[in-house]
Amino acid sequence: MPVVSLAQLLESGVHFGHQTRRWNPRMSQYIFTERNGVHIIDLVQTAQLMDEAYNYIRTASEQGKKFLFVGTKRQAAGIIAQEATRCGGYYINQRWLGGMLTNWTTIKTRVERLKDLERREESKALDLLPKKEASVLRREMAKLQKYLGGIKNMRRLPDGVIMVDQRREYNAVQECQKLNIPIVSLLDTNCDPTQVDIPIPANDDAIRSIKLIVGKLADAIYEGRHGQLEADYEDYYEDYEEYEDDYEGAEGDLDLDSANEEESLEDNNEEE
């Protein structure tokens, strides 16, 4: 039985690509036709590649391997956080900081700083400080939580990355390639399938499409870890249209630690 049916893919709008003038010719093998100036993705291939991705991720999860979810676009951010949390994965859903993986040693020090601030907050130690000093530390903690909260429990580099929009997450792709970390990615018709290990041709702009694909890949991780899916998982698949209005993307700068920003983090301004 396939992981996802053609009917589910159609219903979620997975087949809608970009306008024909915005395509990447390397995606031609995954394009079924063109309609009203928009490319239509071949859902038969999408379903087949979903099976391949699901089996790969489930097997890797059975072996104890860990996955990082990456999706910083507004439509994907909320889904990435919820699905990664649900299956026990890690996630980056705000801005990708330069060196997130290739400079993991430095990033890890910022994660430890976040944990320390959270411990001090939980123990009420911050309440004992002067109000101004406590306020500064709480602002620092909030910013660290925003950008690094999804990898707070990640003790080492991930064994694989699940990504939404390879084109947007170009810096993440480069770092994965340098470290030989496998990438499973949703690819719209403007993406490059040669940059990832398992491509999943799909609409990476529609919330329902992202939810369906990312949700199934999260299922694979959960099944690999626990042997079966929870009975109430079907109830979990709510309509994610609410994220389009309610979820706010990342804003502001990346001054995570003004004291040593230059040596610890690079501002990634890669935008679509």
From Swiss-Prot:
CDD domains: RPS2. GO terms for cellular component: cytosolic small ribosomal subunit. The keyword Glycoprotein does not apply. Residues 244-272 are annotated as: Disordered. One of its GO terms (biological process) is translation. Pfam families: Ribosomal_S2. Keywords: Ribonucleoprotein, Ribosomal protein. The keyword Ribosomal protein applies. Coiled coil: none annotated. InterPro entries: Ribosomal_uS2, Ribosomal_uS2_bac/mit/plastid, Ribosomal_uS2_CS, Ribosomal_uS2_flav_dom_sf. One of its GO terms (molecular function) is structural constituent of ribosome. Gene3D superfamilies: Glucose-6-phosphate isomerase like protein, domain 1 (3.40.50.10490), Helix hairpin bin (1.10.287.610). HAMAP family: Ribosomal_uS2_B. Belongs to the universal ribosomal protein uS2 family. This is Small ribosomal subunit protein uS2. The gene is rpsB.
